[in-house]
Amino acid sequence: MALPLKSLSRGLASAAKGDHGGTGARTWRFLTFGLALPSVALCTLNSWLHSGHRERPAFIPYHHLRIRTKPFSWGDGNHTFFHNPRVNPLPTGYEKP
C-alpha cells in the first residue's frame, strides 16, 4: 500500500523550515578557529624551531639491509632510483659529500 504523496511532502517541507546550523555551526566554528588553527600554528612553530642540521648516524653494515642480488637497471646499478647521497647509504657505507 503506497503512502499518500501529500503527507510525505508536508513532512519534508516542515523539516526544511527549521533553523540551519544553530549551535552546531557555533561549535564547529569554535573547533576550527579556537582549536585547529592554533594547533597547526603551534606544530608549525615547533617544527621550525627544531629544524636544523643534524649529524647523520654512523653507518652500521647490517647484513640484512641493502641487499643487492642483481644490479639496478639504471645508472651504475648500485644506486636506488631516488637515491640521495646525503641521506641514503650504499651497501658499503655513505658516499663522501
Curated annotation (Swiss-Prot):
Residues 50-97 are mitochondrial intermembrane. GO terms for cellular component: mitochondrial inner membrane; respiratory chain complex IV. One of its GO terms (biological process) is mitochondrial electron transport, cytochrome c to oxygen. Residues 13-24 are mitochondrial matrix. InterPro entries: Cyt_c_oxidase_su6a, Cyt_c_oxidase_su6a_CS, Cyt_c_oxidase_su6a_sf. One of its GO terms (molecular function) is enzyme regulator activity. It is a single-pass membrane protein. Its main location: mitochondrion. It comes from the Eukaryota. Heart/muscle specific isoform. Pathway: Energy metabolism; oxidative phosphorylation. The chain crosses the membrane at residues 25-49. Keywords: Membrane, Mitochondrion, Mitochondrion inner membrane, Oxidoreductase, Transit peptide, Transmembrane, Transmembrane helix. Belongs to the cytochrome c oxidase subunit 6A family. Component of the cytochrome c oxidase, the last enzyme in the mitochondrial electron transport chain which drives oxidative phosphorylation. The respiratory chain contains 3 multisubunit complexes succinate dehydrogenase (complex II, CII), ubiquinol-cytochrome c oxidoreductase (cytochrome b-c1 complex, complex III, CIII) and cytochrome c oxidase (complex IV, CIV), that cooperate to transfer electrons derived from NADH and succinate to molecular oxygen, creating an electrochemical gradient over the inner membrane that drives transmembrane transport and the ATP synthase. PANTHER family: CYTOCHROME C OXIDASE POLYPEPTIDE VIA (PTHR11504), CYTOCHROME C OXIDASE SUBUNIT 6A2, MITOCHONDRIAL (PTHR11504:SF1). Component of the cytochrome c oxidase (complex IV, CIV), a multisubunit enzyme composed of 14 subunits. The complex is composed of a catalytic core of 3 subunits MT-CO1, MT-CO2 and MT-CO3, encoded in the mitochondrial DNA, and 11 supernumerary subunits COX4I1 (or COX4I2), COX5A, COX5B, COX6A2 (or COX6A1), COX6B1 (or COX6B2), COX6C, COX7A1 (or COX7A2), COX7B, COX7C, COX8B and NDUFA4, which are encoded in the nuclear genome. This is Cytochrome c oxidase subunit 6A2, mitochondrial. The gene is COX6A2.
